[in-house]
Amino acid sequence: MEYKYSTIVDSSKWDPEGLIEGIPLRKHEAGDLEEVGSFRVQEDWRRLVGPVENPFRGSLGPEISFITYTVPECLPERLEAISYGLDYGFLHDDEIDTKIEEAELDDVGAALAQGGSTGKIQEGTKSSGKRKMAAQLLREMMALDPERAMTLAKSWAQGVQHSARRVEEKDWKSLDEYIPFRCMDLGYMHWHGLVTFGCAITVPEEEEEERRTLLEPAVIACLMTNDLFSYEKEKNDNNPQNAVAVIMKIHKCSEEEARDICKQRIRLECRKYARIVKETLARTDISLDLKRYIEIMQYTVSGNWAWSTQCPRYHADAKFNELQMLRAEHGVAKYPARYSLENRKNGANGVNGVNGINGVNGVNGVNGKRKRSGEETADDARTNGNGIKKPAHVLEYRDSLVLEDIVALSLDWNLPDLSDGVVVQPYKYLTSLPSKGFRDQAIDSLNTWLRVPTKTTKMIKDVIKMLHSASLMLDDIEDNSPLRRGKPSTHVIYGNAQTINSATYQYTEATGLAARLPNPTSLRIYLEEVQQLYIGQSYDLYWTHNALCPSIPEYLKMVDQKTGGLFRMLTRLMVSESPARSSILDQTLYPLSHLIGRFFQIRDDYQNLASAEYARQKGYAEDLDEGKYSFTLIHCINTLEAEASLASEKMALRAFLIKRRVDSSLSNESKREVLDIMKKTKSLEYTLGVLRALQAELEKEVDSLEAKFGEENFSLRMMLELLKV
């Protein structure tokens, strides 16, 4: 990776014991911007929330400040914003530690979830100061990089959700039991969002699990470091959530011995991660952004250690430096940033900048490596130039036309197998596109109650992902849709035939995976629901092809079988694989899955016509191009049929629908005319009213289920909050 904004620093002063040996320490050239962000959030907190120590003992240190050393390759124009976000997190975290009942976790979590869903946080005259601060920060970040700003908001919301569990005291039986909880409590999801935003990184969704696995030693090293240095101020708590305390209790040892054990674990995890970084950078089967992410996160480990050795947050006797004290006393308005963004090219439009490209294999050859014109790389001899391996036998036999060679080939039953590299390419392309991951969230939310083992949960997620992705590939062909998530649809790139082949291959893969689920009943459930998916889709296609408007009941039943089918399938599979399945009635979760399916589809219908963001992702009022009978269009047609005064609008709409059938699309001018007719019938308003009513019913259903299971489901409520219109 090219280093543009940082320089190597000798770490021996901060690490005389060599605990982080093998992981370099770097310093950002624009560290002054971190201080500005930190003092700005302190000033805002005092003004909008309440008193706070001055200077606040957060991310700053007299020699080493946190962001400057942990994100040394942050784009300079984003450094102040992520510094603000980090110390906002520290301020909120301290409030949770001292008075959790006043921390407004629900409000902050809901605000961030809303920001992650819509790109903005609604404010009102009665909004809390914390909500106003979060809204302002999100606005600043959206102006720089909307997609990654929303990703940050979602990640942060997940961290706030976890913080709510601190109300419950934990009695840890082992360090291995403590570590997973502490990994989340560390603010890892918040930090993940800040780093990916700051460095303009987007790890493809299909690499998320691998990202978490590769990163695990780094996260453990950081949590052990934090616990090692924070124990002094936490040791007098009734039940400190700290690795040193856990080790002392488990091993019945002294504090000094526990600290030594903690250090040895840090050394071990650092060595693991240094090896992972080296191995990851040598790989050719993962995206460039995952490589960058794993490399960049090593500086979180080294920077966190160096910062922890001298920061006032962990050391009561540590003093801030002179400039920090001046800014604390007089404000950043009087002592502004000394670093000038204008005097430095920021490189934001580079390979992975704000407008960068993060394709599966990059844009200029295998894994994004650029080749000089006419130059052949070592891999070119083994690939077709697009990262797909040539079959081995092509290299061995070449293209011989000698009769004996042809006969020998014809009689050879042991020719090397053809890999699945070609058939999965369209699928890999689709799954590399940005996704909100609602179905994974639904599975995780249900697991709050169902307690399905992690391995089985992952299998169910993969089954649903394969089916959903395959259905999108086929839907786009059937609907002749040119865009998917703001990018060209799969068939536009790979052609209809190859896309259909890839999609049906994924159906067979999903079936094979469903057959390997522990409970044999799961395969039957899977097959039943796949049949329903096809039946539901058949009616959608039938109505479109024949220009037949269904009734509302027919439409809802189609939705139950098509869109709701995947939600129902994942619900039934999770119940089938739950250890508590014997005590759960078959119908317990059916109303929830049906409501989510109907809400999701009607919401999609509404946004297709009313959302500017949806238009950017899929095209302007795309459902009208496809000739689909959406909920809104059905209401419009029914209203026109019932209102004699709208006879001319009825004729006009019918003419537009016939024109769409003949031309296979409508012009934007025609679409605007159709939308004007819908405004006269108030169909969009009606659809929005139905959505809000369904949202209320969903909330009631969650209340009912929480009562039945005896456990609140914050993650499910968060998911529903993200879906609000």
Curated annotation (Swiss-Prot):
Basic and acidic residues composition bias: residue spans: 373-382
UniProt: Mg(2+) 3 binding residues: 475, 479
Binding-site residues for Mg(2+) 4, renumbered to this chain: 475, 479
Motif, DDXXD 2: chain positions: 475-479
GO molecular function: lyase activity; metal ion binding; prenyltransferase activity
Enzyme Commission number(s) from the entry: 4.2.3.145, 2.5.1.29, 2.5.1.81
Binding site for substrate: 93, 182-185, 226, 230-234, 313-314
Cofactor needs: Mg(2+)
Catalytic activity from the UniProt record: isopentenyl diphosphate + (2E,6E)-farnesyl diphosphate = (2E,6E,10E)-geranylgeranyl diphosphate + diphosphate; isopentenyl diphosphate + (2E,6E,10E)-geranylgeranyl diphosphate = (2E,6E,10E,14E)-geranylfarnesyl diphosphate + diphosphate; (2E,6E,10E,14E)-geranylfarnesyl diphosphate + H2O = ophiobolin F + diphosphate
Stretches the record annotates as Geranylfarnesyl diphosphate synthase: 323-725
GO biological process, one term: terpenoid biosynthetic process
Residues where Mg(2+) 2 binds: 93, 97
Family: In the N-terminal section; belongs to the terpene synthase family. In the C-terminal section; belongs to the FPP/GGPP synthase family.
Entry domain remark: The conserved DDXXD motifs as well as the NSE/DTE motif are important for the catalytic activity, presumably through binding to Mg(2+).
Descriptive protein name: Ophiobolin F synthase
